[in-house]
């Protein structure tokens, strides 16, 4: 069986994950299928994604994959759910950390997001996910839910930094932080030689994200 290539990097400075609970052989096999499916989706794209291609990646029979995921849509949705929830869980753990100040929590999350979105495999994954959401109702519903969770997470850390912000203002700031990072991912992916240096773009993006959290007061 081939090893998994696509993995979320650890959140630098953030809390480490607890050891996973004991899994049954069935649970372990399902996770192996999903891990292979994430690789296939990122490398081959939405149009070429299939249970057969995942089975080939795992070097198992098609019926083995179909035993856990009966059709392509179920496999696709669960693949994207696993990837999206991986990010949300890591960032939620960072936000809940008592060892970090609110500002440090945001800085760690933004640093990690900016690092992840400059990875070619991560870019490919999210571009393909956005494309598939235009054609697959199940993927669209999942993406809407994950995006809502992501914006809520950012809104909460904004409120931690500046408690005086009204709920709507914090939601706007969180949404703009997400837009800043995702927009930068697109711009840098398709930018030409005239694009400003990445180091400068990342530095300014971090400052913009922090500035969005501050209104009539200093960040915590």
Predicted regions, residues:
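Short, basic, alpha-helical segments at the C-terminal edge of helix-turn-helix-like DNA-binding modules
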Residues: 81-87
